[in-house]
Amino acid sequence: NKASVVANQLIPINTALTLIMMKAEVVTPMGIPAEEIPNLVGMQVNRAVPLGTTLMPDMVKNYEDGTTSPGLKSVVANQLIPINTALTLVMMKAEEVSPKGIPSEEISKLVGMQVNRAVYLDQTLMPDMVKNYE
């Protein structure tokens, strides 16, 4: 039995998902697989999602099964991030960009790390922009 993504709180329509809004639970019927949680961060829901509701692919804008496979998405700034700011989840989103930056699977690892320069809205985070990122 694989876990699915379940709403950990009421998520209003058009809200960009953050890690604290989601949890992994084994539910029937299955929804979006729990291992997709890092890729869902920054994606918007297209309807209000009540607490405890299983997230289905059609509830998340631009979510298609398969397009969130690892390595496709990069971490992108969700806002202007001033120099020396410690990163938080709300500052980052996952997007398919070219050239590729830090993989979206790394978002949780980036939390608390500082940027060594100003990062603009929609700018791709590159490894050399984050202090002590390896």
From Swiss-Prot:
Organism: Lycodichthys dearborni
Gene3D superfamilies: Antifreeze-like/N-acetylneuraminic acid synthase C-terminal domain (3.90.1210.10)
Record domain AFP-like: where: 4-63, 74-133
Tissue spec: Detected in blood serum (at protein level).
Keyword Ligase in annotation: no
Family: Belongs to the type-III AFP family.
Site note Important for ice-binding, residues: 9, 14, 18, 44, 79, 84, 88, 114
A Pfam family: SAF
Annotated protein name in UniProt: Ice-structuring protein RD3
SMART domains associated with the record: SAF
Record bears the keyword Translocase: no
Linker: region residues: 65-70
Function: Contributes to protect fish blood from freezing at subzero sea water temperatures. Lowers the blood freezing point. Binds to nascent ice crystals and prevents further growth.
Record localization: Secreted
GO CC annotation: extracellular region
Keywords in alphabetical order: Antifreeze protein, Repeat, Secreted
